[in-house]
């Protein structure tokens, strides 16, 4: 008989952070943890088909199994390409 596990689900914005603790059955997935957290209803900007997810800063898939004590993280999409930003900074410093 599977037991219960406790998992945290985190989502951070520049102005506010969300951290929800949920209790799930052993063998639950990342997606089940996110859905159980209620964050999808609270934040309509989260789209699991677009937002990447991870467990303790390591990339994960929605189908990955979570373990007791895990922190599932929902990442916001990048608003700018990091390579492009570095190129722009390099050009700016070269022009000084």
UniProtKB/Swiss-Prot annotation:
Phenotype when the gene is knocked out: Deletion of the pasT-pasI operon causes reduced infection of the mouse kidney but not of the bladder. On rich medium operon deletion decreases bacterial persistence about 100-fold. Forms small colonies on rich medium. Delays growth on minimal medium supplemented with threonine, increased sensitivity to oxidative and nitrosative stress. Growth defects are complemented by low levels of PasT expression.
Signal peptide limits: none
Protein origin, superkingdom: Bacteria
Keywords, in A-Z order: Toxin-antitoxin system
Stated family: Belongs to the UPF0125 (RnfH) family.
Described function: Antitoxin component of a type II toxin-antitoxin (TA) system. Unlike the case in E.coli K12 high level expression of this protein abrogates the toxic effects due to overexpression of the cognate toxin PasT.
Stored PANTHER family: UPF0125 PROTEIN RATB (PTHR37483:SF1)
Name of the molecule in the record: Persistence and stress-resistance antitoxin PasI
Organism: Escherichia coli O6:H1 (strain CFT073 / ATCC 700928 / UPEC)
Gene name tied to this protein: pasI
